[in-house]
């Protein structure tokens, strides 16, 4: 069953396991939510854990939209291993929290946050993102993105890139190539590495 949910500590986690077709997953979400929607009051914010996030990145906006139909908001997307057996969970500091924006960034607009930033929308030319942690963009990136300003192990993940400048920690990179597929950008050996996901 690719879609399931669990209560853990004070959080509800929506788990999405490996799946073949997005349409089948969305139908399963409908079937499951129709059975349990009476448990939710329309104010819940849940965590989303998706297996093979890099491969399925382009599906995230449709998955979030489907869950939103049931008046449930995604407060964070878990991008690493979520250890539900851990005896204690370190309380997240304010500056480490993930913020989610559902908008397009227009020229002249800028968003900054000390933690991670998830943007469901496009970063247009002339706009800018500055994050202390990781930046995930479910859209095209044509503006300047600076990630890892407080955590050098952060990364940038986006559906496409055609931007003049990317930065992770203190490593800057001027692009001379356009990426039309999802791409994972990380720092290694003082350089930015680009892994295109095809």
Curated annotation (Swiss-Prot):
One Pfam family from the record: MinC_C
Self-association and partners: Interacts with MinD and FtsZ.
Protein's name in the database: Probable septum site-determining protein MinC
Gene3D superfamilies with a match to the protein in the record: 2.160.20.70, Cell-division inhibitor MinC, N-terminal domain
Protein family membership: Belongs to the MinC family.
PANTHER family on file: SEPTUM SITE-DETERMINING PROTEIN MINC
Keywords: Cell cycle, Cell division, Septation
GO biological process annotation, one example: division septum assembly
Upper classification of the organism: Bacteria, Thermotogati, Thermotogota, Thermotogae, Thermotogales
Stated role: Cell division inhibitor that blocks the formation of polar Z ring septums. Rapidly oscillates between the poles of the cell to destabilize FtsZ filaments that have formed before they mature into polar Z rings. Prevents FtsZ polymerization.
């Amino acid at each position: 069953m690719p879609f399931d949910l669990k209560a853990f500590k004070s959080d509800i986690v929506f788990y999405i396991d490996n799946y073949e077709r997005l349409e089948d997953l969305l139908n399963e979400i409908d079937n499951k939510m129709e059975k349990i929607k009476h448990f939710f009051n329309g104010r819940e914010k849940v965590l989303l854990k998706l297996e093979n996030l890099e491969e399925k990145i382009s599906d995230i906006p449709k998955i979030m939209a489907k869950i939103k139909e049931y008046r449930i908001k995604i407060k964070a997307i878990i991008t690493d291993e979520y250890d539900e057996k851990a005896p204690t969970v370190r309380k997240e500091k304010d500056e480490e929290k993930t913020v989610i924006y559902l908008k397009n960034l227009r020229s002249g607009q800028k968003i900054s946050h000390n933690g991670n930033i998830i943007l469901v929308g496009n970063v247009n030319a002339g706009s800018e993102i500055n994050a202390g942690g990781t930046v995930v963009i479910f859209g095209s990136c044509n503006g300047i993105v600076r990630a890892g300003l407080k955590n050098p192990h952060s990364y940038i993940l986006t559906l496409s890139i055609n931007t003049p400048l990317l930065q992770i920690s203190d490593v800057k990179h001027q692009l001379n190539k356009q990426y039309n597929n999802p791409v994972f950008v990380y720092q290694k050996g003082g350089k930015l590495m680009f892994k295109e996901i095809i």
